[in-house]
């Protein structure tokens, strides 16, 4: 019983640590997404990245490189790009770049894994984008994309604003604030449940369980090709049940690597943050299930091929990383400290409070609108119930942590 209570407390603190690490990235991504929705015209977006040419894909990838690494924030921005007329390939290139090519992700990988995985992440990110482009070109989902655009236009937020009005009109700030709040309203349930499950898995499930999933792990010599391919396919399955996000799954990836999982399995696990269930749900709420499953299928095929290519690229070059070089998960309490995350969280917390004040003030003046995206389907009701249960679980676990003490 004591072990269960200790793990419960660790799970709650781990979840809190994951969210603490990602909060500023969520906020940054949703600010960018909100700004695109409020200020960018459809004509400008179509002109910039409206077609799947090298320039459009390159620009979209560069914008993704500069953006937040948070999966949910990237999803929101991608939806905004599509709604404003961006082509499917450039929009998906932005999504892949924002979760695979950002600088902070490389830093985290270097800390938990090794330099080879940093190279694999960035080279693999480029390969993912090129393979995605090829798959979309072959499958030609034009009719599906048109239906998605019709849905996004129906859900649109009215005429765009002039960004210069930020300096002279509080109404524009209020509109930006409402859009920002709507971004959070659409994903808070998925984020809460996903991060809570990640904390539970990190605390209760031993690393040996995940290494058991990957055939060829722990054997003498290099795994055979079919074992490498199987590990690349199973990597997304493991990620599906351990969703944390493009940043948070790196510590779990280090545990897999420390227990002998191949480079292909690790890279596939890392690349899989965009095809797990919470992400599928968010995409389905944006585009419908058919489009969400299409995107997941494209990403799955691309990441399996990419992971295998990276594995053999290192093997043939003699630069394969040494098994056992990773350090594993940090202690739950080690995620909280006075560092850049603390400063950024304070800054974006202040931005969020300011937006909240603007929304409240607009309602007090009779302005603003109330938006309810909760829905009434059984799936939405179930997810809301799970999110509320997650809050109870986390609150009780954090209280336990206070009584139990320790790291």
Where are the regions that the model predicts?
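Juxtamembrane and boundary regions of transmembrane helices in multi-pass small-molecule transporters
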Residues: 51, 56, 116-161, 282-368
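Alpha-helical membrane-protein architecture signal
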Residues: 8, 12, 55, 59, ...
């Amino acid at each position: 019983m004591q072990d269960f209570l200790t793990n419960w407390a660790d799970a709650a603190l781990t979840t809190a640590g994951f969210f603490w690490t990602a909060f500023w990235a969520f906020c940054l991504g949703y600010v960018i997404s909100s700004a695109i929705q409020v200020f960018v015209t459809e004509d400008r977006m179509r002109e910039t990245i409206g077609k799947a040419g090298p320039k459009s894909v390159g620009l979209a990838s560069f914008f993704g490189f500069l953006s937040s690494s948070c999966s949910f924030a990237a999803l929101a921005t991608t939806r905004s790009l599509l709604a404003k007329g961006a082509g499917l390939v450039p929009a998906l290139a932005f999504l892949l770049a924002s979760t695979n090519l950002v600088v902070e992700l490389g830093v985290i990988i270097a800390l938990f894994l090794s330099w080879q995985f940093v190279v694999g992440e960035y080279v693999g990110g480029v390969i993912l984008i090129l393979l995605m482009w090829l798959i979309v070109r072959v499958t030609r989902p034009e009719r599906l994309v048109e239906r998605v655009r019709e849905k996004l236009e129906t859900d649109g937020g009215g005429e765009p604003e002039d960004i210069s009005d930020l300096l002279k009109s509080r109404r524009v700030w209020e509109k930006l604030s409402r859009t920002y709040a709507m971004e959070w309203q659409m994903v808070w349930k998925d984020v809460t449940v996903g991060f809570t499950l990640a904390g539970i898995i990190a605390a209760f499930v031993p690393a040996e369980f995940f290494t058991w999933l990957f055939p060829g792990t722990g054997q003498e010599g290099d795994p055979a090709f079919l074992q490498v391919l199987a590990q690349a396919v199973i990597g997304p399955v493991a990620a599906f049940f351990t969703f944390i996000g493009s940043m948070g799954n790196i510590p779990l990836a280090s545990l897999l690597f420390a227990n002998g999982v191949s480079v292909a399995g690790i890279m596939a696990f890392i690349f899989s943050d965009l095809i797990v269930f919470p992400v599928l749900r968010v995409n389905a709420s944006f585009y419908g299930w058919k489009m969400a499953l299409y995107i997941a299928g494209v990403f799955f095929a691309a990441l399996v091929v990419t992971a295998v290519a990276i594995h053999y690229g290192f093997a043939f070059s003699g630069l394969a990383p040494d098994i056992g070089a990773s350090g594993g998960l940090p202690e739950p309490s080690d995620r909280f400290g006075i560092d850049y995350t603390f400063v950024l969280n304070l800054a974006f917390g202040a931005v969020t409070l300011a937006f909240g004040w603007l929304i409240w003030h607009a309602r007090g003046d009779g302005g603003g609108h109330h938006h309810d995206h909760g829905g009434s389907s059984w799936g939405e009701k179930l997810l809301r119930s799970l999110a509320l249960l997650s809050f109870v679980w986390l609150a009780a676990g954090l209280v336990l942590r206070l009584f139990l003490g320790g790291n």
